[in-house]
Amino acid sequence: MAGSPCLKLIEFAGEPIHVEFRSNLRARRGKLDERGAEVHAASFLHRRLIILDQELLRDKRDCERILAHEIFHFVWWKAPAVRKKYGSLIRQEFVAGTPGEMGWSADWRKQALHPNDVRNNSRRFRDYVCESFCDSCACLLLEISRHHEITLPPSARKTRRHFFEANLAGRRLKI
């Protein structure tokens, strides 16, 4: 998604977010749990903490992408108007049958959706929209246009880029 340098004008405002690296991250039911599924990262909004898997230190670009994704969870949490607008955009994509996503985190959630989830604005749909926002923001901010997890068609990427330029670029985003 090259061509979105104005997104780099984003300024984050808020208390510091602490970042830790740990080995063998696993999560279950929204908590880190050694019996859970492997994850790359976890965010704890109220504690202002992001935990990244140590393995990410082997791949600088993936580490940056996943850290940016996690930071945008804090933006999502503090931006109800953007949440509502982005949810409408994603609902339109879903109704149009737009395939793919900007990252694995959103993609597997999208594939698990049922039409009733979208119609009823279910928790499953809201979680998907959040992950889609964070994956998309991370790729736009870092100008990542090619990655094996990016499967969203170019036309939908362009629409999202315009959305982010209109709603986030040049703004001071609360985290």
Roles of regions detected by a PLM:
Residues 71-87:
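Catalytic Zn2+-binding segment of zinc metalloproteases
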Residues 60-69, 74, 127, 131:
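Active-site alpha-helix of zinc metalloproteases
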Residues 10, 41-42, 49, 66-73, ...:
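A broadly tuned preference for mixed-charge, low-complexity surface segments
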Residues 18, 40, 46, 69, ...:
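Histidine (H) residue identity feature
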